C-alpha cells in the first residue's frame, strides 16, 4: 500500500538569523505519520548558512534539542535539500545553526503515513 500524505505546510518563512527556529511539529502533526520529510529551500542570492533538524521530548523545550542527523549546509543558491526522518519523533523543528548570508531560507514539512 502506498503512503498517504497526512500534511504539508511551511514551517519557516524567510529565515536568516543564527538560531532562528521553525514552527514546531507536535504530536498533533506527527501522530499519524510514518515518515517526515523537510524540504529546506535556500533562496536566490544566498551564499552561506546551515540548518539543523532537531527533536525534543516536549513542545517548547528550552534546553538543547537532540540533532536529527548532520546540519544541512548551504551548497548553492536556489537549491532544495531534503531531510527524511523515519520512525517516531515527539516534537521536531529546524534551527538555523549558521546564519543565512545573502538571502533567506524557507522550510516545508510533509508528513506521510
Feature-to-residue mapping (PLM):
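Edge beta-strands of jelly-roll/beta-sandwich modules across compartments, strongly enriched
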Residues: 51, 95-113
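Aromatic, loop-rich ligand-recognition surfaces of beta-strand-rich domains
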Residues: 25-49, 108-112
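Noncatalytic modules at the cell exterior or secretory-pathway interfaces
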Residues: 33-40, 85-103
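Transition segment at domain starts
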Residues: 1-33
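Exposed aromatic-hydrophobic patches
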Residues: 23-28, 78-86
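Short, surface-exposed beta-strand/strand-loop-strand elements in extracellular ectodomains
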Residues: 46-60
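Solvent-exposed serine/threonine-rich low-complexity stretches and specific carbohydrate-binding patches
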Residues: 9-14, 65-76
Amino acid at each position: 500500500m502506498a503512503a498517504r500524505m497526512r500534511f504539508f505546510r511551511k514551517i519557516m518563512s524567510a529565515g536568516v538569523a543564527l538560531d532562528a527556529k521553525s514552527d514546531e511539529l507536535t504530536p498533533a502533526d506527527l501522530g499519524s505519520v510514518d515518515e517526515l520529510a523537510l524540504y529546506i529551500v535556500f533562496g536566490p542570492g544566498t551564499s552561506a548558512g546551515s540548518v539543523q533538524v532537531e527533536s525534543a521530548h516536549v513542545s517548547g523545550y528550552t534546553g538543547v534539542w537532540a540533532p536529527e542527523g548532520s546540519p544541512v549546509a548551504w551548497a548553492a543558491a536556489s537549491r532544495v535539500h531534503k531531510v527524511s526522518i523515519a520512525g517516531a519523533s515527539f516534537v521536531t523543528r529546524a534551527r538555523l545553526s549558521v546564519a543565512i548570508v545573502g538571502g533567506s531560507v524557507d522550510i516545508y514539512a510533509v508528513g506521510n503515513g
